[in-house]
Amino acid sequence: FELAAINEIADANTVAHLARYDSNYGRYPGRIALSGSLLAIDHLLVPLSHEPDVAALPWGDLGIDLVFECTGAFTDRATAEQHLHSGAGRVLFSHPAESDVDATIVYGVNTETLSVDMDVVSAASCTTNAVVPVLATLSETFGVEAATITTIHSLMNDPISADPSV
């Protein structure tokens, strides 16, 4: 695949900084620079926009085949269809979605259920992708009657970090 565009609400300097430095992978060894409204990643020039209105995105003009919807703000077919109406061929949610999407896929577990007529798909949650492949293997090999997991997650924008009753 080829990275064809990035739409990020953060300003261009922040996008470039976050592309250059990663807390897990360290500093990107190649070139990251800004050139007007383009993000230069080595020799690849990627159009960078900051459009909050999905319906106003120029996916058709840019020839976008697949939008990775990673905001977490959009979770249903209606909002995904805004990307489709803007010219994208398909939408993949990087997070859990509502039940009105074509499928929720956990790679290696139910990948075979994907079909070419699906245009809005969810990749499930990070916890699901960490646990379900292992659990599926255990279930197929030994059988699993019940399971409980505990996940420790970094603070995100949506949970309340303190007891509101205090």
Predicted regions mapped to residue ranges:
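N-terminal Rossmann-like NAD(P) cofactor-binding subdomain of oxidoreductases
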Residues: 1-161, 165
